[in-house]
UniProtKB/Swiss-Prot annotation:
This is RAS protein activator like-3. SUPFAM superfamilies: C2 domain (Calcium/lipid-binding domain, CaLB), GTPase activation domain, GAP, PH domain-like. One of its GO terms (biological process) is negative regulation of Ras protein signal transduction. Residues 34-44 have a biased composition (Polar residues). The gene is Rasal3. It comes from Mus musculus. Pfam families: PH_RASGAP, RasGAP. PANTHER family: RAS GTPASE-ACTIVATING PROTEINS (PTHR10194), RAS PROTEIN ACTIVATOR LIKE-3 (PTHR10194:SF96). The keyword Ribonucleoprotein does not apply.
Amino acid sequence: MKPECGQTMFRTFWSRSRDSSAMDPPLQSEEDSQTQPSLPSPLTSYRWHTGGSGEKAAGGFRWGRFAGWGRALSHQEPMVNSQPAPRSLFRRVLSAPPKESRSNRLRFSKTLWGRHKNVAPLEPKPNPKAPEPELELVADPDLPVAQIPEPPTPDMPVWNIDGFTLLEGKLVMLGEEEGPRQIRVGSASSENSMQAALGNLKDAVRTPGKTEPEAAGSNQVHNVRKLLKRLKEKKRAKSELGAYTPRDGPPSALGSRESLATLSELDLGAERDVRVWPLHPSLLGEPYCFQVTWAGGSLCFSCRSSAERDRWIEDLRRQFQPSQDNVERQEMWLTVWVHEAKGLPRATVPGVRAELWLDGALLARTAPRAGPGQLFWAERFHFEALPPARRLSLRLRSAGPAGATVGRVVLELDEVSIPRAPAAGLERWFPVLGAPAGAVLRARIRVRCLRVLPSERYKELAEFLTFHYARLCGALEPALSAQAKEELAAAMVRVLRATGRAQALVTDLGTAELARCGGREALLFRENTLATKAIDEYMKLVAQEYLQDTLGQVVRCLCASTEDCEVDPSKCPTPELPKHQARLRDSCEEVFENIIHSYNCFPAELGSVFSSWREACKARGSEALGPRLVCASLFLRLLCPAILAPSLFGLAPEHPAPGPARTLTLIAKVIQNLANCAPFGEKEAYMAFMNSFLEDHGPAMQHFLDQVATVDADTTPSGYQGSGDLALQLAVLHVQLCTIFAELDQKTQDSLEPLPTILRAIEEGRPVPVSVPMRLPRISTQVQSSFFSGEKPGFLAPRDLPKHTPLISKSQSLRSFQGAGSWASRRPDEERPQRRPRPVLRTQSVPARRPTHRRPSAGSKPRPKGSLRMGPAPCGRAWTRASASLPRKPSVPWQRQMDQPGDRYQTTGTHRPVGKLAEIQCEVAIFREAQKALSLLVESLSTQVQALKEQQEHFRCQLQDLYSRLGAGISKLDSKGGLPSNGSHRLKSLEQRLTEMECSQDQLRDSLQSLQLLSKTPGSRSQPLPLKAPCVNGADLSMGT
């Protein structure tokens, strides 16, 4: 045998020995992993033989190890547990070192769920990348155990969440897998991942028709040829599996399935210590990832946007924390700005990065920076819903493979979270421990500790914001700083998006901004107003996936490019200028083509807002401002800022280098001028060569602006799709409003009642003593005064409450009902018969299915395994590609109570307090009496109007008769050719009588008008006015003639 073959075999084989003295000394990590006792297992006696330090057997090192391996095979110890026929020892060649117990894995296979639930887990694996002991903090017995799970390793497999759905509390893979997906080759630091991948690979490479070898015999021990042949076959099979899909995309796009090739479902309710945690993009190199950890392992999933990730985290957390909205909890928000460091040793390539550790848990890391002297990062990290912590550590570590620690900054969070800390956070130069003298790190830390109450305590606050956000914004606009406006607008948008009013908020604020600017289009969305900040936050929420699809790929290519596009003659050599101009024009062409062809994936919610703005401009008579309003919001506040700073919008993992950053700046200038229809002038004369580009693509840009502002009749904007922790968002809003109202003048506070009263009640922990008016249509004052002694006010001061109804608010009745249990059995007099469900008929296009049974709302009968719940929509939902357009159940907690199974078929009107029954009966009696009085008044008015109509008809007939007689007399006189001697006297008499008749007609018209006004005024029954002069029937005419 050749020495090379022997060396390969010695580094590959596992040995199993009874005598521990014959084995190599265990590594330090193995000693640490065995600190806790564990149940005996036959796998604990396996050791990995490498070329490390150990005893050399007689006859040379290599052959001595080979002899030791043979001695281990000849001295087999009996198995502790009864096992089936022993497997071939050669089959353990490609297995990972010690096998995991099945209960220690995620229970992937369907056959594993009903079995092996009582198997004791093995010892946890040691962390392959342990921090340096000399820089570790001293253990503090009072320090709380970090609730943040351990971060994944960079080579940990990431699953695409599009291939999963949440059904009945189980995370289920969509479809059946024929075999393992593509294997992503990584380092050997993730032993669990490689073990699962290789363990699943052995079944895929098995040749059809070939049975598994029987138990190992004595002749297999020395048969090295067969062993090497099996090694080559499995290596070839692995390479064939990885040769079908190109490796040029991110792991999630390639459908990574390393560790979970046989995944079927994960029951969150059956696992212990389940936690769902969002991951910073710097940990895995992918944006919008989250991690699911449990007592036996962890998984990482990637999403398409932050809204999709937040929605999945919410749905998963509600599976094992169903009462999250009904309990009080403490949470923390942490924001860290890592600016720069100086005084450190020279940072060679690949550079030095800063890592954020919170109570021993890694949160994020910066991009590496190399070079002599000062290192500049300027990165911002924001974390929400963190568990309470005490200590923040910023560790400067080398970005190389060794990862040597350069120094650290330790900060007690009590210094930052005290009430006297500045609102913007604590910013200063922190000394770096473990580094040369004079090394400092400039950072800014802001910590906010929040007391999150049950969501029902914020009910009145959410109602006030939902119905009176315009009044609130108008009153607070002049009194807030730019930072306060940004924070308040973000909190309002998140809360109103949960209640379904965010689109109306943005539409109304945009219309108000248009009225405030007064037609000065140059000021639209260019100032620090609540409207501008709210629109920024709303577009980031609804258009994040749109940004990824439109600009993600092209911006990442530009960030990775090394081509220079500088066109300023003062910064570029003259011979290179034409080439740079051509590159810039091509890059602008590519970006512009991606934008104008992105209409199909444009968010429908944003299109509806733009359409409403254009309608408002048209109603104001300034229709030309409609495209300017759309352009100022879409390009000035979203697309061009995303091109300028791609890392802030999730388009790039870090801020681009100076060269690509200059290219992105020039492209953003061109796109913004193209949207504004503004050519480059004398201020930027070096960009004048792009004016022809602006002229050529101007019509296409205007067509795109018209497209995005047109609402498709077949497309309905989707509802809420973001994070659902409404209690946390309302707690943030409550803290912000309390801070604002503490410095607000009393006149403004009085104008915003009942909001100050609501804030004080929530702060003091007592029931809210007021109700929020809901903008319901008001009854006419005259009709209301007929049966009400006085109008009931929408807001009552606490001192005036005894004068009106008893103090029973809506939130108090809701809390009393929920405190008794929403699924508690009702009294016999309150029970209502349940409605029978309407049978659903199958259409011809849907295939026949097995009939399902409805789950009863109460009872101890368990639901059959695998059956679907027929009650309200579950917290999880089937996932499809178009996730942003899926409908969603109400995320407002007090509306979600209506969807609980126990209350689905029960009447919601039986929860009113019994103490108000007598008052309600009195009000009903008053309403009935008032209704009877109104009925009698209407009947009398109808009779009077009918009599007046008859009198008017009689007068009209008399007037027509008089006109006919007058015409006959005049015609008779004309036929005789002259008038009699006394004709002049008679003519004057006729004219006088005609004048009297006209006066009578005017008097009759006035009477009719007074009767019509009388019919609208209840309680007045006046008779028609008598005529001042008797009616003349014209008898004198016949006598005169």
